[in-house]
């Protein structure tokens, strides 16, 4: 996880801040993961020329939410009825009441070569909050994103873009590991606190990815604290070795033992 602390009056679409966080996030990846295809997803705050150009310069794949301005509205309304394809959910199943269309006629002059605009149309579900969003005469709501991915399967591209909402899970996890309240009065001290929170979240993510399975691999920090970190244990020495003895009756003691075994089995450098 990477992040920077910004003043309260900072804009949501400040490209330089996005570029800085991007560089930090790429450096946080293991070297082996920095090669090949890397996809960067962002909401419409990332739809700035400077940020998208930086993604293009680095050779990264991108999927960025796009604001629906007047020209985009016209392009959406110009879409033919047979140009819409049923959308899919994250499991590849058809999603009722949702369709996808590529706005190939939208003028994207000024954006990097190969930039495409893809639109999602859906019927709001009954409990949806009413917002001042663009709708057509049938009440459909629309979302648009731009991408440089060449995959002709726009349904898969749209589902992949929508999956970026999992960042909300990381934000929630960060709040549970210290980000909910910045404890200091000074900006620099709170910036250091943010770095510690990012380290904590990074440890949680890699622990879940490499050492845990099942429910624990997707559990919230509070659950991990209770089931694993609160496990009663005792350090003993035997044969010049330090041994951690866990409470045998603790329901998740076996999961913790397995996590240690997986951790010790990892190569020295990943």
Predicted regions and their residues:
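Electropositive, glycine- and tryptophan-enriched low-complexity nucleic-acid-binding patches
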Residues: 1-33
């Amino acid at each position: 996880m990477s992040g920077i602390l910004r003043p309260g009056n900072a804009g949501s679409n400040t490209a330089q801040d996005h570029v800085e966080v991007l560089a930090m996030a790429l450096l946080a990846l293991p070297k082996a993961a920095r090669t090949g295809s890397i996809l960067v997803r962002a909401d419409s705050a990332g739809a700035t020329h400077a940020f998208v150009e930086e993604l293009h310069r680095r050779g990264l794949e991108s999927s960025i939410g796009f604001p629906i301005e007047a020209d985009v509205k016209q392009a959406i309304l110009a879409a033919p009825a047979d140009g819409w394809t049923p959308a899919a959910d994250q499991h590849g199943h058809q999603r009722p009441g949702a369709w996808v269309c590529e706005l190939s006629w939208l003028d994207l002059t000024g954006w990097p070569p190969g930039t495409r605009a893809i639109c999602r149309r859906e019927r709001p579900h009954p409990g949806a909050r009413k917002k001042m969003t663009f709708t057509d005469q049938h009440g459909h709501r629309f979302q648009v994103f731009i991408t440089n991915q060449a995959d002709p399967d726009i349904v898969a591209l749209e589902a992949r873009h929508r999956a970026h909402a999992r960042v909300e899970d990381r934000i929630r996890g960060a709040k549970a590991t210290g980000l909910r309240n910045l404890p200091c009065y000074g900006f620099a001290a709170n910036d250091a606190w943010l770095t510690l929170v990012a380290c904590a979240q990074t440890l949680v993510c890699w622990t879940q990815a490499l050492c845990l399975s099942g429910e624990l691999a997707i559990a919230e920090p509070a659950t991990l604290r209770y089931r694993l970190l609160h496990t009663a244990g005792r350090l003993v020495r035997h044969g010049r070795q330090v041994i951690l003895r866990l409470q045998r009756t603790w329901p998740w003691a076996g999961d913790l033992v397995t996590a240690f075994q997986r951790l010790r089995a990892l190569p020295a450098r990943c």
